[in-house]
Amino acid sequence: MKKGLVLATIFALCSTMMVSAKEFNDARWQWFYSNSDYTGKVDLNTLSYDPSTDTAQAWAVWVQTRGLQELREYDIHFDNSSVTIKHYYIYKNGSDTAINEGTANNTRTPAPGSGGEALIASVKGLVGRDTKLADYKKQQADEAQVQEQKRIEEQQAAEKKAKHERNRDILRGIFGI
């Protein structure tokens, strides 16, 4: 009876610890990079992309082998392959309480072959950047073409009106009207 009570208590404590610990293993977190020091995962639920600025927003977590997890909010600038770390939260493995947090606004270009470069490539594919940017550029070109056509038509109408006025003035001068 006592063994059962002890086992039930241990099970309850383990379950509570597992529920309250900060976990980055559910379906919303997709792996994008690993090395001997850390693993990077991106949050699929918070990805967004703005083709007018060619910038994506993403949250990523870096799970370190030394027992820390760093959750970061990024702006990813595809035009120059740089990232801006906006906010960060650092957790100890197994804890749901951040031991450090802050606002960084630190922009940098990741080194080739690094986790930051892998983050850019992963987010680029996940948000469909190339397709959305091509669609945006086509839409902008189409709108510019429509505006140019409208400008040409307005210019032609103004020239026609000016020619008509000039001819009318000439006829008035000839006939003395």
Where are these regions (language model features)?
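N-terminal secretory-pathway/extracellular module detecting exported/lumenal segments
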Residues: 19-177
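Sec-dependent N-terminal signal peptides
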Residues: 4-15
